[in-house]
Amino acid sequence: MLTQEDFRNKYQYHQATPMLQQYLDIKFTHQCCILLFRVGDFYELFFDDAIVVSKLLGLVLAKKGKHAGQDLPMCGIPYHALESYLPRLVEQEHKVALCEQLESPEEAKKRNGYKAVVKREVVRILTSGTITEESLIKANAPNYLAAIVIYKDIASIGYCDVSTAEFIVIDVSIHNLTSELSRINPKEIILSESLQHNSSLLALFDNYKQKIVYQVESYFSFNKAQRTIQNYYEIITIDSIGSLNSTQVSVVGAILEYLSIVQKHSKSKLPFPQIVSYENFMLIDASARKNLELTSTLSGNLKGSLLSVIDATVTNQGGRLLHKFLSTPLAEVNLINSRLQITDFFYQNLQLVENLRELVKLVPDIERALSRILIAKALPKDLESIKISLKIALSIKKELNKVLEEENIPKYLEEIYNPLFGDDELYDLLDSALLDDLSNSANDGGFIKSSYSTKLEELRNLIYNSSHFIEQLKLQYRQETCIETLKICHNNVWGMFIEVSSKNAHKITDSKFVHKQTTTTAVRFTTTELQTLEAKMLNAKTMAAALEQEILAELCKAISLKSEKLSHLAKSISLIDVFCNFAYISHEFNYCRPEITSDLAFNIVNGRHTVIEKLITKKHESFISNDCNLQNDQRIWLITGPNMAGKSTFLRQNAIIVILAQIGCYVPAQSAQIGVVDKLFSRIGAADDLASGQSTFMVEMVETSVILAQSTFRSLVILDEIGRGTSTYDGISIAWSCLEYIHSNIRCRCLFATHYHELVDLASKLQSLKNFTVKIHDSNDKLSFLYKIIEGAANKSYGIHVAELAGLPRIVLNRAKEILLELEHNKADINQSNNNITKSMDIAVPPYPVKTIEIIKQLNPDQLTPKEALSIIYKIKNTILLEEDEKMI
């Protein structure tokens, strides 16, 4: 950020015209924004903003005269086309400052003479985390703004969705911060600028660098945050909003302060923040969330994700709630079973589901409509949404009453049933005021019924029947003057006037006729009546539009008084949509109700991968189902077998079954018994982290380190090919050690797939580990995958067979077979006579080099994160290699 002096020097402020100086003054206070500067019917951009935006939007880069002897770069956006251009700016993470004219040029001239500059002011800053416009945000996903404060090893996170008036505060361990960020997926993250100098903490936000908004440290001070909260909610003490700790107060205050800056005069009406306990939800680490493709595929697309398969919701708010459910599975038995009861209720009443879905799909996005109404950004359609929702809510309740007794609603259905209400008073008010088939724009009027307001009816009469009023006045004047040829005319110089021929001018004797002009053939007059009519006609359209805005504000106020009930109604409709969706897909895809317990059970019978099943069903193929029983004596399954045989699919499908069960949905299986999983970890697939200079193996080790450090005995751990990114012996050693640690230290349920067949001997050493493999058919050197997981171990990898299926040249395959035979003939016996791998891998450890000792001396192990520790190991390795090279020279 430039100082004012540097800024003015850069843009040669003192050589600028008065209007350009006004632009530069406003731009100085909004240096981080693209400034859209209203000039008449256009938003104009200058200097660097013009260059950036013209390229981004494909606009013509023009020039607006000269400034300081140079062409002034300029491009423009028509004001009526703004909404079509804004999404592309916001999608690119640009902040956009909207600067409007606060007066007309005529008003400016009256105020300060001919050379006066029109008053302008930034009325709003659009950012990706604070927008509410339908055209700028995804309909079926939340749009979160977050603020984070880290104190010791706890991160306080506040996040809100301004478009739906949702506000949540949660504390998590700093070790779980990246997992939580991947769950929330905020569009903007507010951090203290002091974090810019803390590289270890800043590393936690590596994947969110483009979304960070740094604010001065005072934003986060407890005292300032406390005042901000009190002012925002108009309360005397912050105790009114719940038991917030000091860091939670800081994040709430930071969010509210940020909103006050960017929203200017249109302040959001967020509810009190909801304080959430992390223990009630399953933790899904960032890697698992990505690899399981819960809400998007690895390439970032919705199609092909789990969400795309299970989402048959029929409303936008229902789609958003399903997105939240899938991102945040529950981890508390009673809460999960309560949801499953609701799903079961609808599953047992499929005709009701069909009828409700037909009704619910008629409900507009009441949630976001209500939010825009509360922040004075309402469109006419938003009010229509409220009206429609009130009407349909009664029909939904009537439909539910066909299978429920109103006096005896099951407790688990109360949150759905009780908020369904009709408000005749509010409905009648909106129905009497609003026209049908409303447009999105409120600027030009035309959305209020004329019958609603006598004044509006008069103005519209003037607009649409002006010729009739002129004709009436003309006939009146002809009668009064006895001049049958009297006319009422109009031109651009005189406006409206009365005209009579010169020979009839003497007949006009009444003083109300004021002489205006005499021509060679006619004399022109005016009257107070005519001037009043002309003024009304000229201003009628503007006055009607302004009156409609006043009526709109009154209607919004009436809705605001019922906002709490309407918010509960929106939630009820969303829940109905989601649970009807669960019942619908469960019936369509042949899902079963899972049994959720508080123990460590895990017994899936004929489980399926629902995404792949849907994909291959389209090809008229059948999905091969598999059992998975992780009981005490086999809570770790070590799975061997060739690539492409279905190991990874099996791993993923069991994780997906757990997630679906714990969001309250039926699952793709014949039966499922699941002890609640508190954390789900997954290490599947290989990926370099090029941005941070980490190899595939380093990424794998960092992710594995996180899993080993954070898993509990209630977790589900899924590991695929641990150790493959290094030498064979190194890889076997790492995989072996990880298995032992999971078995004996963590003692959790685990699926562990590997190519290291040497590991199968661990089944005789680790009592809770059991070997499983993928069934194949090997006949005459021809390999067929049967995709069935069976007990036992693979005796070879079939890598060359897979290469053959992949289409490698025959000459390469034949040579590979020759080499394989030679290697198998000469390979060392890893297990030796006592089947103990550790003895066969003993190596002589040389003395530590001096530089390595110095590195180790400087370390403080208690302050190292797993990621930092691995980086240091690499540094030590490089140091050893360097010293060995120096000895050889």
From Swiss-Prot:
InterPro entries: DNA_mismatch_repair_MutS, DNA_mismatch_repair_MutS-lik_N, DNA_mismatch_repair_MutS/MSH, DNA_mismatch_repair_MutS_C, DNA_mismatch_repair_MutS_clamp, DNA_mismatch_repair_MutS_core, DNA_mismatch_repair_MutS_N, DNA_mismatch_repair_MutS_sf. It comes from the Bacteria. The keyword DNA-binding applies. Gene3D superfamilies: 1.10.1420.10, 6.10.140.430, DNA repair protein MutS, domain I, MutS, connector domain, P-loop containing nucleotide triphosphate hydrolases. One of its GO terms (molecular function) is ATP-dependent DNA damage sensor activity. GO terms for biological process: mismatch repair. ATP binds at G641, P642, N643, M644, A645, G646, K647, S648. The keyword Nucleotide-binding applies. Transmembrane segments: none annotated. Belongs to the DNA mismatch repair MutS family. This is DNA mismatch repair protein MutS. It comes from Orientia tsutsugamushi (strain Ikeda) (Rickettsia tsutsugamushi).
